[in-house]
Amino acid sequence: MILLNNSHKLLALYKSLARSIPESLKVYGSVYHINHGNPFNMEVLVDSWPEYQMVIIRPQKQEMTDDMDSYTNVYRMFSKEPQKSEEVLKNCEIVNWKQRLQIQGLQESLGEGIRVATFSKSVKVEHSRALLLVTEDILKLNASSKSKLGSWAETGHPDDEFESETPNFKYAQLDVSYSGLVNDNWKRGKNERSLHYIKRCIEDLPAACMLGPEGVPVSWVTMDPSCEVGMAYSMEKYRRTGNMARVMVRYMKYLRQKNIPFYISVLEENEDSRRFVGQFGFFEASCEWHQWTCYPQNLVPF
């Protein structure tokens, strides 16, 4: 694999990946952040250049110092020939199979190569899947070489009803001092490693909230290093009050103004969330969200 660290090549890759949306969105979003300051110190590997078949995004070596930190030890993959991913993944120079890690992608067909590679390394793997939800303007990037999102006005979604703030509630950037609050209410959180990860997401990536009467966030949303919007949550007392809808509208408007790509994943059985985000123009993509969590035998969580 070739390490791609030239800014011109990374920009060319970003534009090229747009042609493979939605399957490439995980990698496309990661390259966006790499091209805009690279706050999570990620690096890009391709099998060849300028023509390529596979792209892998991984943290730089100095980031992966904790063998148990699967929030940091994340590999994001896209392949034009996913059935051929096995040989690449078996290479210990590419994936550190001695660590607990995650492999994320939007191609189910990556799974066979991952399963073969993990079996050869005596690594336990757990597969989880969810629906990938996107908006029309994200899909339009596929047909455009500009790799820019349309403005909020161009999408035609009525946002006036959500724009105005209600008394005692204020839309704001989510402050890193509330990382603990987010961690305590995130299903995948509630531990020290997740707290560290959340702090980085809030500090370095777009995150928004609605402050309640006491000046404390009552609804919030964040973004991960691959431009996936997540951790969205409303405190129980303030649910069904329109606060999360107001946060989402303002947040999405900001992302579009800054030309930041975004998408979300929702469990198929979570019909309430699917209905909720549907009002903002999200719909099911032609592919799904996939994550393979891998544990070396000496680090299995049981």
From Swiss-Prot:
SUPFAM superfamilies: Acyl-CoA N-acyltransferases (Nat). Pfam families: Gly_acyl_tr_C, Gly_acyl_tr_N. GO terms for molecular function: glutamine N-acyltransferase activity; glycine N-acyltransferase activity. Disulfide bonds: none annotated. GO terms for biological process: glutamine metabolic process. Keywords: Acyltransferase, Transferase. Belongs to the glycine N-acyltransferase family. Acyltransferase which transfers an acyl group to the N-terminus of glutamine. Can use phenylacetyl-CoA as an acyl donor. This is Glycine N-acyltransferase-like protein 1. It comes from Homo sapiens. The lineage of its organism: Eukaryota, Metazoa, Chordata, Craniata, Vertebrata.
